[in-house]
Amino acid sequence: TTGVQNTLIGGLAGDAITDADFNIAVGYGSLSANTLGSKSVAIGRDALSNQNYTTATDAFNTAVGDLAGGAVTTGIKNTLIGGLAADRLTDADFNTAIGYGTLSTDTLGSKSTAIGAFALEAQNFTTATDSNNTAVGYLAGGAVTTGIRNTLIGGASGDALTDADYNVAVGSHSLSSDTLGSKSTALGYTALFSQNFTTATDSFNVAVGYEAGVSVTTGTGNTLIGGLAGDAINVGLNNVAVGYLALSGETGGQDSVAIGTQALKTQSFSSGTRPSNIGIGLNAGLSITTGINNTITGTFAGDALTDADDNIVYGTLALSSDTLGSKSTAIGVAALQTQNFTTATNTHNTAVGYNAGYAVTTGTSNTLIGALSGDALTDGNNNVAIGEGALGAETRGDRSVAIGNATLSVQNNTTDVDANNTAVGHAAGQAITTGISNTLIGGFAGTHGTDLTTGTQNLCLGYNVGVSANDAANQIAIGSGFSAGGNNTASFGFGSVLLTIGLDGSDTSWAASSDERLKTNVATSTAGLSFINDLRPITYEWKQRKDVPSDMTRFYEEGSTENCLGSGTTHHGFLAQEVKTVIDSHSEVKEGCNIWSQHSDGTQQLANGNFVPMLVKAMQELSAKNDALEARIATLE
């Protein structure tokens, strides 16, 4: 009647339009029921043939194809292109259907996009529903009935889904077997191809890449990214595989992480097994089959391990030769690179640092921390090396401890031997080759003067203290900057030997430095008989700890009947407090006296050996008196 700018071509085309504008109808019966709907395009036999608005409405519907949108009544803003495209839609809006038979069952579903022959063909909402489904490709989402918010792109992608929601499938035949699984993401040719949940299940699977997760059936919570990543998993759960062929042999295991090309490639466990392996890096953990609880990070790290457990590996080529060794820790490039146990073994080896423990083959229970530490060890056991190059030449020796850069750096036993050397401090024992049972503590300990090389059972304690010969035995040197006096001796000093004690069990006296060339202001002492006569020698027993004054915290222990010092027998000696009083009353002794001293906690102490000069002086005085008396007696006779 009053409609304007309508183009109507074909028998009965737009024959009911009254006051509607800007419509195009081309084809027999197209737009034939419309009265007041405007701005529609209907091209094809009976296209939009039932559209009809009882009030003036801008429909913005477009239907192109035989019977396209033929059932639309009051739906708006639909784009329907293709024979039978959305031909049953009635009061639905904002749909796009392009391709033969697309969206051809739905009646009241809105906001769907179906592009490709038979895409979303079976979708059908009988109540008004915003489906928000997107299907692009031949048969994409072809079986979806009432599922919502699915995005399916690719030929036959998601084509078996029915009442499933929130899935994303991109790639030919991706997610194409599942019916009721929701919240899956499959990107790539046949990604998640076999997944199929027959009851409503939130799978939370993600597969991205050619045939990624292609065999997953009912496994859930898997993240598989990369060509053929996790492609054998069927019922496995909560796995992460990122990289070409990552975790590609796994079937039923759960909770593994494989990141990197071929990481954990051959791992395979039956349903319900929790291997909890982590492989990160090119070929990381490549050969693991049934090993569990391994953490492997780095290119080729742990790539020969098979049925080994509880290993920690960080670094390129770290632990890269071992097959059956378990409970190793290798952190650093090439750490424990050549370790290899061909039978199941708990190695308990720890190597941290560049090339640390590089050459270990079958040695066990070694702790090697520091670049190049213990890097020549092969089958040595129970060694500890901490510091750059520590124990760096040893091959087969056992039970050495080297702490500090270059400590025991040239020690090397070519046969199995308990070396039992301990070196702590920068370069301590750095010259020892085959010496055993030495203890060297302090920077450069064992290197002063003549280097200790093949000696045994020596103790050097202090900076730059040493022994008297390369093959020294049973020498003790404590102090700094000097060498011990000889075998079976203990020497103490700072810069030179101040005291040497024999250690061979014979009646050997203490020897202290007394060279006149070291002394000045020499004078004859007058401290003698008078001082000695004022001393009171006593006998005594040590108190039990409970009886000591409680403020003497080094010795007091409530309720303890243990003697505070020594045994409970009678001893001979002095009381320090009385000796201090005598010293203070003798000016000839008071200056320079080192007989009496006081500990920081207030405990008074005596150095009994320092009475000797006074005793000698007293004897000299008595001897002089005796000589005088004998001379007098002789004159009287």
Annotated model-derived regions:
Residues 1-512:
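Glycine- and small/polar-enriched repetitive beta-structure motifs of secreted/surface proteins
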Residues 512-637:
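Intramolecular chaperone/auto-protease modules of tailspike-like proteins
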